[in-house]
């Protein structure tokens, strides 16, 4: 029977401190509360099984895998990232091995005929023989290259014990742990040595280095009280994501109860380091695409800890955890579009299984209604067999999950204010495909997966983008290098923000909005600091409003010396009906001061970092409208969309 829908009291009004260490607050005692290995079962169910539909899909997937070759990982594949900056050559084949492993293991468990055992043994053996489970894009970390200034092309891990765990090493460990748990008996019939070797590698590559605190400063992802002591970078999605997968290895494979407790005790402060970086509004600064990889991964770790402690470690009622979940639903523009900021992907689909499970556990009805709405019309990712596979415990939960029945209809809010993150959203109607939609972002230019986008606005009309944030493209070596802000989609002049006397916004926490203020239908802020002193800006006040069936964007700029200002507008369609002081986008009229000079350009997207951006928006190219104001000390420009 499907679980019932549970209404709950709205929690948005609850008091909340800004910086919280939730596990520490609750004074949990780990010792004596962690289940031994033989008493732990996925989701607390000894007879865990996927839904009938997913069971059939797993069998079918495994049958297909039987006809396929296991991808070969070559030295030249690993070296390609260092040589060309391309991450996909190695990563695609690497990930395919791990998906094969999971599908074969569960299919063998479901069928029990040894039809998939030998192929599974081959895949596991191939993974065990990999020199390192760390992917080449993360090889530059000092913990794995031992400070080699030349940035090695190939890993050093063959020299001795592993001392670094990245996202993909954690994933690999969890994949093998889950596979061994479910298909261990079949693998033992093939060769008991395979289990022994797998357990040896899991201890060597995952559990032992995790418990060695001497590696933590170099690797950095653990958070260190929220901020890394050397780089001063805050904890991001790596903290809950890797921690959740390490906990999966411990839960399924670690035989010593004392060591299981030690691993959990080490994990809880890391998760607290992550929650310390969230404001009371629960907003994910990394962008909606990273919600599943940040708050979603925290939820997954909490779900595993709940099951591993037989319900003792329970954060599901905490208001911050609930807000972190609900925040994703607040960022939906239409059924098929999320708001893009930071490294958000314009083609993102809602992870309906994760959203609904989060909502059920934390009793947030809005999340369940949102997920059901996206599932019903096919705009969510419910049909993906591998949804959440990069955290295998989450994947198991998703495979066994069914959408609850009799869920009330979802209705988007007409106003959203995330005060700590500084994001204001107004919607003309409580319908996702009707009327005008306005989003305005404040904040600072030093977020995780940062774009220089302080003061950026996004506008939609009847579900169509009028002014947009392009979002993320494809990661390459350049993406996370000093050249990041040479990529156009990260720069302020492609975020509906002006270039002032030739200057655009700068990266850094000091480059931020000041005096962010939101009313019922408008938002304003001072943006001088976002550009820095070199721009010669005395004041730059931006105000955006949605009222009376129109969006009004007003920039008041005062300069120390006369200078030219170019107001940039980014859209997905070429302007039509262009006249002095006006043009149309998707049928909507945009007006601007007639004294400005308008030019239109197709946005270049041939570089590998940006090639997929127009595709995500469903168009051949994006367009940028440039409105140039003559040199002056004072600039007052209002753009109206109606």
Locate predicted features.
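Non-membrane alpha-helical segments in proteins
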Residues: 96-110, 122-126, 170-178
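Carbohydrate-active enzyme catalytic cores, enriched for enzymes
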Residues: 295-467, 518, 525-526, 614
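CBM-like, beta-strand-rich accessory domains located in the C-terminal region of large
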Residues: 2, 139-143, 170, 374-387, ...
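Active-site lining segments of carbohydrate-active enzymes
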Residues: 151-287, 300, 394-408
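Structural helix-adjacent loops and short alpha-helical linkers that scaffold large soluble proteins
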Residues: 108-121, 179-203, 250-268, 305-321, ...
């Amino acid at each position: 029977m499907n679980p019932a829908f549970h209404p709950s009291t709205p929690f948005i009004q609850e008091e909340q401190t800004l910086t919280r260490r939730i596990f520490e607050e609750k004074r949990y005692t780990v010792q004596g509360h962690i289940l031994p290995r033989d008493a732990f079962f996925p989701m607390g169910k000894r007879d865990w099984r996927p839904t009938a539909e997913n069971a059939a899909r797993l069998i079918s997937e495994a049958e297909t895998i039987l006809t396929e070759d296991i991808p070969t990982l070559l030295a030249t594949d690993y070296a390609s990232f260092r040589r060309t900056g391309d991450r996909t050559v190695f990563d695609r084949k690497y990930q395919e091995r791990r998906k094969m492993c999971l599908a074969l293991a569960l299919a063998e468990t479901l069928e029990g005929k040894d039809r998939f055992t030998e192929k599974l043994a081959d895949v596991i053996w191939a993974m065990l023989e990999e020199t390192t489970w760390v992917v080449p894009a993360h090889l530059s970390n000092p913990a794995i290259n031992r400070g080699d200034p030349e940035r090695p092309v190939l890993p050093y891990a063959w020299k001795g014990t592993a001392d670094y765990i990245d996202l993909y090493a954690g994933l690999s460990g969890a994949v093998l742990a889950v596979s061994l748990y479910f298909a261990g008996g079949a693998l033992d019939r093939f060769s008991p040595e395979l289990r022994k070797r797998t357990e040896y590698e899991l201890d060597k590559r995952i559990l032992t280095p995790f418990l060695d605190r001497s590696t933590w400063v170099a690797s950095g992802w653990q958070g260190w009280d929220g901020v890394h002591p050397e780089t001063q970078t805050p904890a991001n999605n790596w903290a809950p994501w890797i921690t959740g997968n390490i906990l999966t290895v411990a839960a399924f494979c670690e035989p010593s109860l004392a060591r299981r407790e030690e691993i959990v005790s080490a994990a809880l402060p890391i998760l607290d380091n992550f929650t310390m970086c969230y404001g009371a509004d629960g907003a994910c600064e990394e962008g909606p695409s990273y919600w599943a990889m940040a708050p979603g991964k925290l939820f997954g770790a909490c779900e595993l800890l709940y099951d591993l402690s037989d319900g003792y470690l329970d954060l599901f009622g905490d208001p911050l955890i609930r807000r972190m979940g609900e925040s994703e639903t607040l960022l939906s523009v239409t059924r098929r579009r999320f708001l893009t900021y930071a490294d958000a992907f314009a083609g993102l689909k809602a992870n309906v299984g994760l959203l609904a499970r989060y909502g059920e556990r934390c009793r947030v009805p809005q999340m369940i209604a949102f997920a059901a709405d996206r599932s019903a019309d096919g705009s969510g990712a419910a049909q993906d067999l591998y949804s959440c596979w990069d955290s295998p415990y989450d994947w198991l939960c998703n495979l066994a999950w069914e959408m609850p029945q009799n869920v009330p209809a979802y209705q988007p809010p007409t106003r959203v204010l995330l005060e700590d993150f500084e994001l204001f959203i107004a919607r003309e109607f409580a319908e996702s495909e009707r009327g005008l939609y306005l989003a305005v972002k404040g904040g600072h230019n030093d977020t995780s997966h940062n774009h220089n986008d302080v003061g950026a606005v996004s506008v939609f009309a009847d579900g169509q983008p009028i002014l947009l944030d392009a979002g993320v493209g494809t990661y390459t070596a350049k993406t996370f290098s000093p050249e990041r802000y040479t990529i156009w989609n990260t720069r302020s002049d492609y975020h509906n923000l002006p270039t002032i006397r030739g200057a655009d916004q700068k990266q850094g926490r000091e480059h931020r909005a000041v005096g962010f203020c939101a009313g019922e239908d408008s938002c304003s802020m001072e943006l001088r600091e976002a550009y820095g002193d070199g721009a010669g800006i005395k004041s730059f006040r931006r105000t955006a409003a949605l009222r009376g069936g129109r969006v009004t964007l007003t920039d008041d700029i005062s300069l120390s010396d006369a200078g030219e200002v170019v107001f940039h507008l980014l859209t997905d369609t070429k302007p039509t009906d262009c006249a002095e002081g006006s043009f149309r986008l998707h049928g909507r009229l945009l007006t601007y001061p007639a004294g400005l000079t308008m030019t239109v350009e197709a946005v270049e997207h041939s570089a590998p970092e940006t090639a997929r951006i127009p595709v995500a928006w469903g168009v051949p190219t994006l367009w940028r409208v440039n409105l140039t104001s003559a040199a002056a000390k004072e600039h007052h420009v209002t753009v109206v969309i109606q």
